[in-house]
């Protein structure tokens, strides 16, 4: 039998790099639920679960439970086979040929094929989609050109040769391409479902996915409920049967739910409580590759002047912010790429 603590650790791995600060709650008595149920307090209501249109960390966290791509990241952040059982790369590093696992299915039981990937990627790049994640597919041959209406859909470097084979051509060799494939912008979508209802990704009754879980219910701004997807290719390894995720943007409310035994974990506890929680062994600090930043409206005065923008950047005391405000092991950042 798997105890609650072990089960929680497995779920942390499933969430991947989106988790930075987690609070675990351990209670006894009638509030303990089945050990195969996970109760995670989501920090924001998703505006959509459409992989092409989502842009926030909470949306990505939910999608990680509902969708799966050609590859996924292991607990060390390295790509491993997922829907693709294998792949080959051309000598010049610009052409990838992916071979899908046999008998893949959507959560509604319909066959999932390489054509679903081709459709999804080209849909994301289609300017009429208005996809926030389109830029993530600019590594594809003519991906950026198509997104900017300078190339045709058929010019994009992704083609399903048959139901089980997907050929991808890149603009140039891209060492991190396999890691990109694990992100939501590269998830497949069901063409029939998408084209039947433009709001397909905003309701549990219409959302069709392919990941380890299915969306059973979605009470907007209230709670999301998940159930194990029996059609998932790796279903035998999914030990969690159900998940109940209350939604709250309030850090204090999320912490109250966890400490009161109404939830198992949350992300980003209030700064004032972090030391207490860490001393109690309830706070887990893990790595996250990401940035917090401010954006200037460069079309409005005075930020049309680059020197003004530089001046604002220079007077921001990043070390002070990290040490005394955000805390949690974060480091000051001076660029998007920290290495």
Whereabouts are the PLM-identified features?
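A structural "hinge/loop" feature
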Residues: 44-61, 83-84, 110, 126, ...
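Surface-exposed ligand-recognition segments of extracellular binding domains, strongest
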Residues: 22, 77-105, 118, 135-192
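N-terminal lobe/hinge region of extracytoplasmic solute-binding protein
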Residues: 41-91, 122, 208-209
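Ser/Thr/Pro/Gly-rich low-complexity linker/stalk segments immediately outside membranes or between
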Residues: 28-40
